[in-house]
UniProtKB/Swiss-Prot annotation:
Phosphorylated. Phosphorylation inhibits activation of tubulin polymerization. Methylation at His-107 by METTL9 reduces zinc-binding without affecting heterodimerization with S100A8. Ca(2+) 1 binds at residues 24, 29, 32, 37. Disruption phenotype: No visible phenotype. Alters response of phagocytes to stimulation with bacterial lipopolysaccharide (LPS). It comes from the Eukaryota. It comes from Mus musculus (Mouse). Residues 13-48, 55-90 form the EF-hand domain. Disulfide bonds: none annotated. Homodimer. Preferentially exists as a heterodimer or heterotetramer with S100A8 known as calprotectin (S100A8/A9). S100A9 interacts with ATP2A2. S100A9 interacts with AGER, and with the heterodimeric complex formed by TLR4 and LY96 in the presence of calcium and/or zinc ions. S100A9 binds quinoline-3-carboxamides in the presence of calcium and/or zinc ions. S100A9 interacts with amyloid-beta protein 40. Calprotectin (S100A8/9) interacts with CEACAM3 and tubulin filaments in a calcium-dependent manner. The lineage of its organism: Eukaryota, Metazoa, Chordata, Craniata, Vertebrata. Ca(2+) 2 binds at residues 68, 70, 72, 74, 79. Coiled coil: none annotated. Changing residue 105 to A: Reduced histidine methylation by METTL9. This is Protein S100-A9. The modification N-acetylalanine is found at residue 2.
Amino acid sequence: MANKAPSQMERSITTIIDTFHQYSRKEGHPDTLSKKEFRQMVEAQLATFMKKEKRNEALINDIMEDLDTNQDNQLSFEECMMLMAKLIFACHEKLHENNPRGHGHSHGKGCGK
């Protein structure tokens, strides 16, 4: 039996994991993001979704502090995924924002547009 190609969602999950590791292994522990790595990832990978936040160093620091639940000044993959979940939820809501059908179910242009 031939291997089935990964689905779009499976590829998206793999991309998120790979992107996290692309930044997490730059300095310190290879499986956590330092403040510098987190800022670099937000600026490069979330530039459209977080365009206001990425220009504000203090806001980036506040976001990291909120995500850093064990207060070790690093973000584990799990802690970082809390941000991804919030962004996905906010993006979903934004897609429905101007739709007269609400969640009835058509999507607009997308987040960051």
